Amino acid sequence: PIFWLPYLSQSMGSELGYQFTPGSRSNWGAFLLNKYGIMLGGKENPISGRKEDQWLLSEWLFDIRSKRGIGVGVDFTDQRLDSNRNLGWLKTYYATDIDPTISRTSLPREQIDSNRYKLELKYRFDWHNSPSTTTIADANLTYLSDRHYLEDFEPRNYTLNPQPDNIIGIQQRSDRYQLGAFTRLQLNDFYEADTRLPEIYLDHAKRPIFNSSILHEGSSSIGYYKEELGSSDPVRLRSEAENAAT
C-alpha cells in the first residue's frame, strides 16, 4: 500500500517562511500584505550539500490594497550586524498607485505620479582595523518617489522619521581621537535639507597639556554648508508672504 500525507511546514524563525497580514485602513481600503523570508549567502557543505552560515535575510513582499493597487518589494538584511539593528539593510519597494490623491488628512496635495517607490540603504562597512585604530564607513541613504510616500505606505516610519537624512561618511577612531568626514545630500529635492559638502571633524580625548596636570579635550570641524529648499518651498513661502501682507 502507498500512503500519501500532505503537510504544511513553517520555520520557527519569526522572519522566515510565509507570513501574511490582512486588514483595513481608511487610506488603503481592505489589504493583504504578504511576505516570504529566506536566508541567502553562506558556504556549501561538501558532505551534505546544504548551505551553512547563511547571513543574508531576504524578505520578498507582495501587497494588495483595494484603494491603492499592488505593491512589490524585497528587503535584504545582513544578520552579521545584529548588534545594531539600525544598520545593515537594503530595502526596495514599488507600487502602482491607482489613486495617489487619497490622504489621511484634509490637506490638499500636488499632483503625484502613480509610480511610487522607495530605495533605502543603511550599512556600516569595516574599512580597516588595526590594534590601535578602527576605520569604518557608513551609508544612510533613502530615495523616495515623492514627499507623501512614507505617509501613504509606511505610516509608522513616517511618524518616527518623516524626513529621512541622506548621509555618507567615514571615520577613524582610537583611544586618543576620532577623525571623520561626512556628506549630507539632498537626494529628495522635495525635502528641505541642510547639506554639508563635506564636513570634516576631529575630536580628541582628554590629555595632559605639556605633561602637566592640566587636562584638555576638544572638538573642531570645518565644512561647506548650504540650506537647500524643497521644490515646493518657494511656492509655500510666497503664499505665506502674500497671506501675511493681506
Give the residues covered by each predicted segment:
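Outer-membrane beta-barrel proteins and related beta-barrel translocases across Gram-negative bacteria
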Residues: 1-246
